[in-house]
């Protein structure tokens, strides 16, 4: 079982190598990189390319590791017992299977996405060490042990909001998705806009990469934001020359909102555009 990329996702050779290394080693693949570099989409593409199910677990600040295994709905059972419902006699009626349980009982290969693991409490990764290592866990309420007959491919993403525990890192294969260079970015854009006018793409790309290099930029625009910007330019039929117009009044209104996401960067962008145009 090897991942060779897909037509809808530009995977660099080193990224494909990382995916296949994790599969060979039977270890979780920990993916880091700037927001918008395709970390989450990678799991979807791996599952699609290999023709296997994808089970997604999107982590929040309140997420607990137990939720990935199962949850026992004691409140519903208490309510049903008060109503005299017969199903209270079978405690399994109140067990809600988590993503890991669902993957373990597939009986065939699958992909588990644990998305943005760094959003959770610092102990969250450690609480999953045994389960991800042994691919099994115990259900105390029913006295079952749930084991994976076929080991799933586990892809874990992180935006580096907090450091992950060393014990967790030792059990993962790590890959950092570098921000795409101009050539790779063109390939990514071609996937989304195969018939885009090259002069418009060239101007938009220049503005995009210039913005990323501006000193003092609080949040650099990402790949997904470039795609949004191009969608707006195409939808509004904006000519390429409008991106370089010396008339400040013709600055494309959607452009700043697609690429820049806070007022400090917007004001910085406006000042730089104004100065650059009047120095030409």
Question: Where would I find each of the regions flagged by the language model?
Answer:
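C-terminal regulatory/interaction module of P-loop NTP-utilizing enzymes
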Residues: 1-280
């Amino acid at each position: 079982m090897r991942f060779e990329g897909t037509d809808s996702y530009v995977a660099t050779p080193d990224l494909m190598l990382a995916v296949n290394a994790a599969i060979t080693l039977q270890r979780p693949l920990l993916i880091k990189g700037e927001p918008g570099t395709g970390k989450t989409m990678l799991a979807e593409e791996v599952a699609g390319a290999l023709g296997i199910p994808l089970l997604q677990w999107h982590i929040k600040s309140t997420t607990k590791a137990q939720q990935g295994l199962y949850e026992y709905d004691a409140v519903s059972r208490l309510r049903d017992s008060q109503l005299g419902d017969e199903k209270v006699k079978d405690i399994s009626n109140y067990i809600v299977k988590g993503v890991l349980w669902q993957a373990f009982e597939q009986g065939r290969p699958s992909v588990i996405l644990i998305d943005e693991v760094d959003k959770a409490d610092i102990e969250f990764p450690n609480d999953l060490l045994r389960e991800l290592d042994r691919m099994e866990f115990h259900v105390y309420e029913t006295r079952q042990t749930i084991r994976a007959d076929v080991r799933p491919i586990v892809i874990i993403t992180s935006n580096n909001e907090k450091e992950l525990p060393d014990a967790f890192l030792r059990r993962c294969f790590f890959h950092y998705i570098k921000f795409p260079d101009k050539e790779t970015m063109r390939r990514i854009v071609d996937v989304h806009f195969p018939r885009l006018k090259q002069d418009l793409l060239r101007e938009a790309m220049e503005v995009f990469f210039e913005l990323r290099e501006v000193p003092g930029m609080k949040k650099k625009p990402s790949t997904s934001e470039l795609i949004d910007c191009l969608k707006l330019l195409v939808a509004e039929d904006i000519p390429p020359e409008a991106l370089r117009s010396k008339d400040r009044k013709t600055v494309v209104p959607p452009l700043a909102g697609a690429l820049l996401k806070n007022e400090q960067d917007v004001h910085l962008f406006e000042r730089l555009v104004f100065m650059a145009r009047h120095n030409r």
